[in-house]
A protein has these predicted regions:
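Basic, glycine/lysine-rich polyanion-binding surfaces/domains
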Residues: 1-191
Length: 191
């Protein structure tokens, strides 16, 4: 089945921009076929549902093994898991949410996940994003819904290196990837 699945970015990524010293100033990659589940849940909010941790603090991420849960709103989360995990996760979460008003949806094909890493990753994002991405304000484990180059994205900082994951609608992924590559060009010169 894998040979029938395609990404809109398969001919663009991975991509890296070397600085004058030869080390990558910024690199772009794609997390292909990551499973994504949307969860809407009415209060009271549990700390876990179906064994999946729910961050209750705004704009935070909870991690348990390979499952990441991003807080998107007071009653909304995005759960990501490795390829093939959705049927089991959907079952667990749906069963756990059966006694409360909830919506559990497989969103796996709706967004592409672009990974941005390297010493200039933050500077690249700051070119098109109005969020304060300074390390005091946006740290590993932070996430936010925002605009990047005018497109709605979900931004998830995964490490202090820094590295980020950008969740973008599948239909806009190629345009955003082209924008990122073009915007990164200035970082070819070390400085």
């Amino acid at each position: 089945m894998d040979e029938t699945r395609h990404s809109p970015l398969e001919d663009l990524l991975p991509w890296a921009l070397p600085a004058e010293d030869g080390n990558p100033a910024v690199s772009l990659g794609e997390l292909r076929f990551v499973q994504q589940i949307g969860l809407r849940l009415r209060p009271p909010m549990p700390a876990y549902i179906g064994g999946v941790p729910l961050p209750l603090q705004p704009n935070r991420v909870a991690v348990m093994r390979a499952v990441r849960t991003l807080w998107l709103g007071p009653d909304e989360w995005l759960i990501t898991a490795p390829d093939g995990a959705v049927p089991e996760l959907l079952s667990w979460i749906s069963h756990a949410a059966a006694d409360r008003r909830a919506q559990v949806t497989d969103l796996s094909a709706s967004r592409v996940i672009i990974e941005i890493a390297g010493p200039r990753a933050r500077a690249l994002l700051e070119k098109g994003c109005g969020l304060d991405l300074h390390p005091r304000a946006f740290t590993p484990g932070s996430c936010a819904q925002t605009l990047l180059a005018g497109l709605p994205v979900i931004l998830d900082q995964t490490s202090a290196a820094p590295s980020y994951r950008l969740f973008v609608r599948r239909s806009a992924a190629r345009w955003l990837c082209d924008w990122l590559i073009d915007a990164a060009e200035e970082f070819r010169v070390a400085g």
